[in-house]
Amino acid sequence: MNPLLLAACVLVTAQPDFEPTSAYTVQAIEGWTVYVHNKLLTEKKDLGERTLKLLGARLYDITRVVPGPAVEKLRKVRFWVEENPKVACACYHPSRGWLAGNGFNPEKEKSIEIGGPGNFLGWAACQPNMVLHELAHAYHHQVLGYDQPDIKACYKRAVESKSYESVLYYQGGKKRAYALNNDQEYFAELSEAYFGTNDFYPFVLPEIKEHDPEMLKVLQKVWGK
C-alpha cells in the first residue's frame, strides 16, 4: 500500500465517532450547566432556541417543587443538547465505559443528553416531566446509589404483587407500567407522579398514596419531603 494512503487510513480510523467537547458552547440555565452543540446556535438556531426555552421552563418547574437540598444535588448534573441520531429523545448516561464503547463522548458520563430535540419538543405535552425523570435517574445513581435498599424492596413488592401489570395509561386503556422495567425506572416514574404528573397510573401523588403507600414513604424519605 502507498505509505501516504496508509497514513491517511490511520488518521481516518483514529477519528472519534463523537463530536468533541469543543463543538459545544457552555450555558447556565436555572443553575444547571448545559453544553449546547454549536449547530443549534447557528445553522439550526430556531430548533435550539425552542429546545433551550423548554428545558429552562422544565428546570424552573423542578426548582419550585423539589426540596432545596435535593435541587442543589441535581444541579451538579450537566446537560448536553444536540442532534444525535443515537438518542431518540433524552437519556441519562451513568457509565463512562458504555459511552466509550458505543461511540459517545466519554465526558458525558453522569450527564443527561437531550439528543433528539425534535422529539423533546414534540413529546412535551404527553410527558411533561421528562426532564425530572432523567434527573431522578441521576439522583438515584449519584446520590442514593443503585443499591438503595428501600427502593429495591418496594420494586420487588410491586413486581410480586403484579399491581403494575395492567394500569391506566394517559391515552386511555390499560398497559403494563413502564415502572416495571427495573427498579431504576420504577423510582423515576414514581418520582414523576410524586412531584408532578406521570403518563402511567399512578399519575399523581394522591394515587401513589392509594396504590403504593410504602413507596410513597420512601419517596418522602429520599427526596426530603
Question: What are the residue ranges of the model-derived segments?
Answer:
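Metalloprotease/metallohydrolase-associated module, dominated by Zn2+-dependent proteases
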Residues: 100-119, 125, 155-225
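Sec-dependent N-terminal signal peptides
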Residues: 2-12
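Short acidic, Pro/Gly- and aromatic-enriched capping/linker segments at domain boundaries
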Residues: 14-26
